[in-house]
A protein has these predicted regions:
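N-terminal intrinsically disordered/low-complexity leader segments
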Residues: 1-5, 139
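Short, structured helix-loop boundary elements
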Residues: 7, 28, 50, 54, ...
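Helix-turn-helix
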Residues: 9, 13, 17-51, 55
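Short amphipathic alpha-helical elements of helix-turn-helix/winged-helix folds
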Residues: 13-17, 90, 126
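Hydrophobic alpha-helical connector segments
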Residues: 55, 69-95, 137, 143-154, ...
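Short, basic, alpha-helical segments at the C-terminal edge of helix-turn-helix-like DNA-binding modules
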Residues: 58-64
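Amphipathic alpha-helical packing segments from all-alpha helical-bundle domains
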Residues: 65, 110-137, 145-156, 160, ...
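Amphipathic alpha-helical segments used for helix-helix packing
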Residues: 92-114, 128, 160-167
Length: 191
């Protein structure tokens, strides 16, 4: 196996482990054991635990951005609800690791925070890029710096609501949650 393929395999295993473990629980030792290789080989590919964690988090964020990619849906609110559904599914399937990633990003690690913020920025930017001039504008939501700021706030609220909903749905169905969150963006932006 080529070095690039082996590194890719280890990153994939790391992101799989992140779905059921916290970032702190994914050590070089755990990954080496799961992969059936020596710790030294892992250090060869990642240098140290921090570099490994950064690579795994970057890969997890890339996967999240990829799975929430827009579908070919003309109605911008429906499109947003579908993307939010993919996001919700990702959080459900990777709850432990996702919450760990959010906490690590809000902690003292600048590199993890940067990766997390880049992912969030990509998701918010996509709302405006994908919907284009006939999308959010069709809802009466212009693409302005002020609206982008409010969209950032909506994104943070959406993340908090989804993480809480996974633990306790508070009597709100999945569909209702997605529709309310999608509808909240224009409501917040136009308030």
């Amino acid at each position: 196996m080529s070095p690039e393929s082996r590194r890719e395999q280890l990153l994939e295993l790391g992101t799989q482990l992140l779905s059921t473990r916290t970032l702190d629980e994914i050590s070089i030792e755990v990954l080496a054991e799961e992969a059936g290789i020596s710790r030294g080989l892992l250090y060869h590919y990642f240098g140290n635990k921090q570099e490994f964690h950064i690579a795994v988090v970057r890969r997890a964020v890339e996967q999240l951005v990829a799975i929430t990619a827009p579908r070919d849906i003309e109605n911008p609110l429906e499109q947003l609800a579908v993307s939010l559904g993919a996001y919700l599914d990702y959080v459900v399937e990777n709850y432990t690791g996702y919450v760990s990633l959010v906490r690590a990003a809000s902690g003292g690690n600048d590199e993890l925070r940067t990766i997390y913020e880049e992912g969030r920025r990509a998701l918010v930017d996509r709302i405006f890029e994908v919907t284009g001039p006939d999308g959010m504008d069709a809802l009466g939501v212009p693409d302005t710096p002020a609206v982008r700021l409010l969209a950032d706030g909506w994104s943070a609220m959406t993340e908090a609501v989804i993480v809480a909903w996974v633990v306790d749905d508070h009597g709100i169905s999945r569909e209702e949650l997605l529709q309310r969150l999608a509808g909240a963006l224009p409501a917040i932006a136009l308030a």
